[in-house]
């Protein structure tokens, strides 16, 4: 079973940040949520919820 989450960034910046702490079980649902939730000037990306991505985006101080 794969799980997914969404990160976002301003089109003017390089770094993605955690968008929401919601976890999705379908990539399609995560992408749709990201598309409908983004403001103009932002882009989103759907990522696998794994230890590498978790450490990179969730454990940011």
What are these regions (language model features)?
Residues 9-11, 21, 38, 51-52:
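Compositionally biased regions
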Residues 31, 35-61:
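Short, mixed-charge low-complexity intrinsically disordered segments
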Residues 24-27:
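Conserved aromatic
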Residues 1-20:
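Short aromatic-glycine-(Arg/Gly/Cys) micro-motifs in beta-strand/loop hairpins
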């Amino acid at each position: 079973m794969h799980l997914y989450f969404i990160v976002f960034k301003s089109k003017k910046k390089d770094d993605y940040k955690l968008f929401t702490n919601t976890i999705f079980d379908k990539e399609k649902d995560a992408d749709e949520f990201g598309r409908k939730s983004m403001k103009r000037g932002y882009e989103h990306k759907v990522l696998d919820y794994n230890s590498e991505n978790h450490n990179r985006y969730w454990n940011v101080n």
